[in-house]
Curated annotation (Swiss-Prot):
Coiled-coil regions, chain positions: none
UniProt cross-references to SUPFAM superfamilies, sorted A to Z: YbaB-like
Protein's recorded name: Nucleoid-associated protein VSAL_I1086
Species name: Aliivibrio salmonicida (strain LFI1238)
HAMAP family per the UniProt record, alphabetical: DNA_YbaB_EbfC
Entry keyword set: Cytoplasm, DNA-binding
Length: 111
């Protein structure tokens, strides 16, 4: 049924290897930093692979200098709030799909 002697053991070994590779990949992605730009580089947001904002940069030509730091902090906070809300929405929708069955910790939707 599973390819002869040892077939089931090999299948389980392959599944474990795949799980290990996926976990390593998720850790690598989580440690990445990616910068997005808008306005031809006038606004830059750097986030981690886990969607946490690391840095927000706004060209001073877009505002008064004394408000720059506060605006940067507000943009970062708004982005983090939106990211948190997306995670909550995904969990709620997933609960509807799975009939309320709890998913393992760290389980992410494929999209």
């Amino acid at each position: 049924m599973f390819g002869g002697k040892g077939g089931m053991g090999n299948l389980m070994k392959q599944a474990q290897q795949m799980q290990d590779r996926m976990q390593k990949m998720q850790e690598e992605i989580g440690n990445m930093e990616i910068t997005g730009e808008s306005g031809a580089g006038l606004v830059k947001v750097t986030i981690t692979g886990s969607h946490s904002v690391r840095r927000v940069e706004i060209d001073p030509s877009l505002m008064e200098e004394d408000e720059k730091e506060m605006l940067e902090d507000l943009i970062a906070a708004a982005f983090n709030d939106a990211s948190r809300r997306i995670e909550e929405t995904q969990k709620e929708r997933m609960a509807g799909v799975t009939g309320g069955m709890q998913m393992p910790p760290g389980f992410k939707m494929p999209f």
